[in-house]
Amino acid sequence: MTNSEIQDLLNSQRSFFAGGATLASEYRINALKKLKNSIKAHEADIMAALKTDLGKGSQESYMCEVGLTLSEISYMLSHVKRFMRERTVATPLAQFASRSYVKPSPYGNVLIMSPWNYPFLLTMEPLVDAIAAGNTAIVKPSAYSPATSEIIKKIISECFKPEYVAVVTGGRAENTCLLDADFDYIFFTGSKAVGREVMRHAAEHLTPVTLELGGKSPCIVAPDANLKLAARRIVFGKYLNCGQTCVAPDYVLCHRIVYEQFIDYLKKETIRQFGERPLDNPEYGKIINKKHFNRILGLIDRKKLVLGGACDEAALRIEPVIMRDVTYDDAVMQEEIFGPLLPVLPYDDDEAVISQINSHDHPLALYVFSNSRSFIRKITSRISFGGGCVNDTIIHLATSNMGFGGVGGSGMGSYHGRDGFDTFTHKKSIVDKKTWLDLPMRYQPYSSFMDKMIRMFLK
C-alpha cells in the first residue's frame, strides 16, 4: 500500500470510531464472537500456514498459537462488561458535594505490528485486547511469515469492514508509511533495533506505545534443584519453535556442584524429546530464513559442543545444540540467540550471578530452579526482569489472569487479560460536581477566614 492509501484507510477508521459504534459492549462482544468463530473455521488453514512459514507441527501450533488466541477471546468475552464499567472512587471532603469516578475509554485508532516467530498468536492476541477495549485497528503482520499473514488477512477481512479492523501486508516501505501516520496508540512486538525506530516515530506524534521486545533470558539451576525435571522443562522451553521464542531460556547458569550431572540430564532429555535424528523429526521446526540460519550457525563453538550441531541448509533446520564451559566472552553470549542453541555456564557464587545478570539489559524472562524459598526470593527480588517461572519455563505467558511484558531493554507495557484491556484503554478521571452547594473558599477575593478553611480541608 502507498502512503496515501494508508492515510485514507486511517481516515476511514477515524470517521468510524468517531461514530461511537465501538463504545457499546454488545458491539465488542459480537466482534470477538465473529473472530472466534472464524478462527475455528480456518483452523486447518492456520496450521498449514504455520507449517509453511516455520515448520510447526499441528499440536505445537494449536498449543502455542491457535489455542492461546481462543483462550484470550474466551476470557475477554467473560470479563469485558466488567472491565468497561465506571469505577467510583473516594472524593476529598474539600470537593463536597460531588461524585468522582474513573471512566475506561478506548484510545481510538491503534496500530499493531507483529513479529514472525509466533505470527498468528502475536498478531491476534493484542488485536483481541484492542477490540475488547473498543478501538479500531490496523494490523501489520511480518513479511517474514507470508503464509500466516495471508490467512490472518483472510480471517480479518471476513469478520470486519476495513474501517473497523484492517490488515496491511508488505515490508519495510509499508512499515515506514504506517509509522509516519498519526495513530492514537502503537503496539509493537519485535527486535530492540526496530523497537527503537518505532519509539522514534511515535515521539513525533507523542503517540503512546507498548514495546514487547526480547533479550537474553537466563535460567538458574541451583544445587538443590530437581535436576531431571529441570532438564526436561528447560529442553521444552528452549527448543520449542526451534528456539525462536522471545521468552526461551537463552542460557543456563548451573551451580558447579551439579554441573556435570545436569549436562548429562540435558543431553539425555534432548534426545528423549526429539530423537537421535531430530532433523528427521516432522514435529521439529525450522529457522525462519537463510539470514537467521547463517547467524545462528555462526554462534556455535564446535570445541564446546555436547550435543547437536548438524544442519540441513535446504530445509533451514539446525539440530538442538548444547554447549558447555561457555564464558561471557563467547560469541553466543553477545546477543540474543533466538535459535536452538543452549549455552550452559557454571557458577559458584549466588551474588556473582545476581551481579552478572544485573550488569546487562533487563531480560524479558528469568527462570530459577530450586527448592529453597529463600534463594528463590533472593533471585526474584534482586534481579529486574519482565516475568518468569520458578521450576519451569515460558508458561507464565500462557494465561490471561496476569499480564506479560518486559522492563528496561526488554520492553515496556504489558498485555494479556485485564492488562491487555488496560493497555488499549485511557482511563478518564471525572468529578461530577453537584449544583445545590457551592462552597466559596476557592473564589477570590481571598480572606484569612477562607485561608483557615482551606488549611482545615487540605492537610
Residue ranges and their predicted role:
Residues 1-101:
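N-terminal Rossmann-like NAD(P)+-binding subdomain of aldehyde/semialdehyde dehydrogenases
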Residues 160, 193-327, 390, 452, ...:
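ALDH superfamily catalytic-core signature
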Residues 93-229:
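Rossmann-like NAD(P) dinucleotide-binding subdomain of oxidoreductase/dehydrogenase enzymes
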Residues 84, 169, 307-309:
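Short loop/edge segments at beta-strand edges and connector loops
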Residues 24, 220, 271, 317-459:
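Conserved C-terminal structural/oligomerization subdomain of aldehyde/semialdehyde dehydrogenase
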Residues 6, 25, 43, 227, ...:
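Residues at or immediately preceding the N-termini of alpha-helices
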Residues 28, 73, 134, 165, ...:
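Residue-level signal for inorganic ion chemistry
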Residues 17, 21, 36-39, 43, ...:
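Structural signal for hydrophobic packing residues in well-ordered secondary-structure cores
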